[in-house]
Each structure stands twice: as C-alpha cells, then as structure tokens.
Amino acid sequence: DLQCAFTSLQGFLKGSNDQSINVFACFDNEEVGSGTKQGAASTFLYDVLHRINNALGKDDEDYYRALAASFMLSADNAHAVHPNHPSKTDVNNCVYMNEGVVVKSHAGQKYTSDGVSIAVFKGICEKAGVPVQFFANRSDVVGGSTLGNIAMAQVSMNSVDIGLPQLAMHSSYETAGIKDTYYMIQVMEEFFNSHIEETSAHELKAVSYTHLRAHET
C-alpha cells in the first residue's frame, strides 16, 4: 500500500491537466475495516469532491454528471508468484516483480475493474511505455478486496484496480521490485496528464494532453 501511495503521489505531483481536476486520495485504516473518518468507507472523498463542485458554482446535477464522467485508479499491490509457493497462483494469471504494473480482476467483483476500464488503462500504459500484467486469484482460493469498491459506495464512477507485484504481503518481509516503482510513477504521471472522455459511441478513451501539447509545439 505504501508503495502505491508513494508512486501515486509522485505521479500526481508530476501531472498537469487543464481539462480535468486531478485528485489524489490516500485513505487510512484499511486493515481494520476502513470505517474511520479517514477511511475509504467514510464520506471524506464524497465531501471533498462536493465542496470542489460547489466552489466552482455548480449544482448537484453537475456533480452527479461529473462523477459519471470521472475515472479512478484504485491502487493496491498484488501477489507476485512466490518461488517457494508457486501453486498458490493461478497458472494463467501470473505476475512477477519488476515486470510491470498489474491490473487485477475478480469474477466476484471484489475489484472495480471491468472490460471498459481495463481497456482505458491499457491505453494509458501504452502511452507511458509501461508493461502491463494481469492478476486474478485462483478460483478455489479466497482473496481480499481493495479500497476501490469501498469508496464506490460513496462515489460511483468508472474505475480499474491496479497495483505492483510483491512477495509476502502483510508480513515483516514484504518484498517488491524497484523497477516497478518507476513503472508506476510513469503510468500515474501519464494518467494525471490525461483527460478521460466518452465518445459518441459511448466508449471511454484517454486523451493525453502532454502529447497534444508536444505535437502543437
């Protein structure tokens, strides 16, 4: 979680977007249920977004339309294939340290990813030149969830669950890759430089204003 919090913040600080309002949200108390005033289950994100909307002179209808047009990256690490316990991993959804950002999917909807949001995120990764891996739990192994779905109870929007591969999650020997840290900063910067918009065909696409500005100059 700290790795994703750090890289997300770095991308947020590096990003520049004059077409959208960039938001970086970092929640506390996930491991004890997220029910605190600073947790993902609180109204904190909803309240902040509503205040921004009000400060811009917008009404409630504008707020709900803005949410529907928004896009969230729910960033929380993923389980890499462990060399001592390879059988714990689904053989068709293996992720490895230092081989790129992970997109997480779950048939039981424990992650926010869907076909549309995954496609949008893959496009952002391609623009950033960052490799992508795909993770899903073994169907007979119970896995956890992330803050994305918890936050969705307050602010419904398009979202994809991503993270970085690591070993020994939640232990005192958590291990992750340094290259993945740089990969995540790159893709986060590209995300915060992009404007996610809906086309006339009701498809979502990411328009990179960094690339547009470079083309214009």
What is each PLM-predicted segment?
Residues 28-36, 52-53, 60-66, 137-141, ...:
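A domain-level signal for the structural core that forms small-molecule/cofactor-binding pockets
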Residues 1-6, 115, 175-178:
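Short, conserved micro-motifs enriched in small and acidic residues
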Residues 6-96, 196-199:
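Acidic/histidine-rich catalytic neighborhood of metal-dependent amide-processing enzymes
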Residues 210-217:
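Conserved small/polar residues in nucleotide/adenosyl-binding loops
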